[in-house]
Amino acid sequence: MAKLALINREQKRADLVKKYAGKRAELKAIIDDQSKSEEERYEARLKLQALPRNSAPTRQRNRCTLTGRPRGTFRKFGLGRIKLREIAMRGEIPGMTKASW
């Protein structure tokens, strides 16, 4: 189990990403727009840099929702590989069976 502080940190990052997503997209659109003046694009770049670092989606880390494990996480389920296997073996995930060939 990951430390609670790490899980809370990731939750805080997720909240910040959600909060600043619109503002960030707006500023990026101005920066990418070639028809805008160079000065206006520069101002948008400065405003983008002034946003909190943790509001960038690249700083998020996928973690298991049950254990907080940062590696081996399946995005589709939001679970780590270990917990995914345990739950699948109990038959709690519809349609998921152990592979055999």
Curated annotation (Swiss-Prot):
GO cellular component: cytoplasm; small ribosomal subunit
GO MF terms, alphabetically ordered: rRNA binding; structural constituent of ribosome
GO terms for biological process, alphabetical: translation
Keywords: Ribonucleoprotein, Ribosomal protein, RNA-binding, rRNA-binding
Pfam families membership: Ribosomal_S14
Residues passing through the membrane, by range: none
Domain of life: Bacteria
Alphabetized InterPro entries for the sequence: Ribosomal_uS14, Ribosomal_uS14_bac/plastid
Cited function: Binds 16S rRNA, required for the assembly of 30S particles and may also be responsible for determining the conformation of the 16S rRNA at the A site.
Entry-linked NCBIfam families: PRK08881.1
Family: Belongs to the universal ribosomal protein uS14 family.
Subunit architecture: Part of the 30S ribosomal subunit. Contacts proteins S3 and S10.
Protein name: Small ribosomal subunit protein uS14
Encoding gene (name): rpsN
